[in-house]
């Protein structure tokens, strides 16, 4: 069996942004956010939408928001925009949070997005998030 090649990440860190991203072993992306400042959100939005333009397979992504202390309305609006992209239907997304306040804010994104977007779940334990992401992707369809 020929192993499918992993797509390049095409991400470059920039001064002043509050997130990093690395390619996951399964080909998805692992984002780690430390803040959701305007600069961070603009950079993330551009990167995320660019990747969605090239989405050609089912993907598992992990967003680690445990260091984020507050989710702004702007962050929710950007999340809704990206989650509404038609290519988002190919993504299984686990979000890891550290507080009920962050969980409640993040829950607004799928609640305000038209059906058919990302398969989305929120966790407080990163190992539980990984176990959920590891389920076969064929369960999405």
Range-by-range predicted roles:
Residues 2-141:
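Amphipathic, Lys/Arg-enriched alpha-helical "gate/interface" segment within cytosolic domains
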